[in-house]
Every structure is written in structure tokens, then in C-alpha cells.
Amino acid sequence: MSEKKLASDYFMEGLNCAESVIKAYNEEFGTDIPIRVASGLGGGCAVGNLCGAVNGACICASFAKGRDDIGQENPAKTYTKKIMQKTIEHYGTTECKSLKKDRVGCKEIVDFSYEVLKEALK
């Protein structure tokens, strides 16, 4: 049996930060969120804004807890809020360029975001 990969392992293999979180979620939970939905989100949407790893975690939470149609309640917001709050509590920001300025490595935030996602969904 092979050892379970960390989200950052996928990052080191060439996926961007957001794609890596989604790939790890798919592998652990047997889902099939298309990786391509996150292809433009790495590097803070390529301009240093919302961290791609955090964004990827929010995509997974929305997939797991989101609504399917107009008029339905939207519980996904509760979960994405938890992800955002935990990240801000820990790092003081969710902004990619600020995280990098503070020398937070992408591998670190990818694994952190994935763990926060799993904790939020419990």
C-alpha cells in the first residue's frame, strides 16, 4: 500500500497551489472535482490576491456543502468563512503576495489550507 500523499506533494509535482488542494481532496474523498477549475487561481489569481491554496480549499468546501439551484439555502458560506477565518487567525492574511512577503512557503500554505478544509468540514 502506498503512503498517502500530502497536498504539497502534488504542488511539488507541478500542480499549482489551488489545483494541489483539490487533487488531495479528490484522492482522499473519492470525488471528481475537475482540477481545471483551479488552473487560473495559482499565485493569487496570477496577481498576488487571494491565496490559491485557500481558494482551492473554498472550492472543495463549496463542492461538498454548496447548493445546486436557485432558492436553495447556501450552507457552503459557513464553511468557506471558517477556512478564511482560520487562515487569517494563523497567518494574519489570505493574500498571496503578503504571505510570500512574510516568507510563508507555498508548500506550507497548501498543506495548511488542506488541513483547515478537512477540519472545517467535520
Predicted feature descriptions by range:
Residues 22-40, 88-91:
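Acidic-glycine-rich active-site phosphate/pyrophosphate-binding loop
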Residues 75-122:
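C-terminal binding/interaction regions
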Residues 28-37, 62-79:
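Phosphate-handling active-site elements
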Residues 5-13, 40-49, 98-103:
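A short glycine/serine-rich beta->alpha loop
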Residues 23-27, 59-66, 115-119:
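Short glycine/serine- and small hydrophobic-enriched flexible loop segments
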Residues 41-63:
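Glycine/serine-rich anion-binding loops at beta->alpha junctions
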Residues 1-26:
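Active-site-proximal helix-loop elements at catalytic-domain edges
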Residues 16, 59-62, 104, 108-111:
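Mg2+-dependent prenyl diphosphate-binding active-site environment of isoprenoid biosynthetic enzymes
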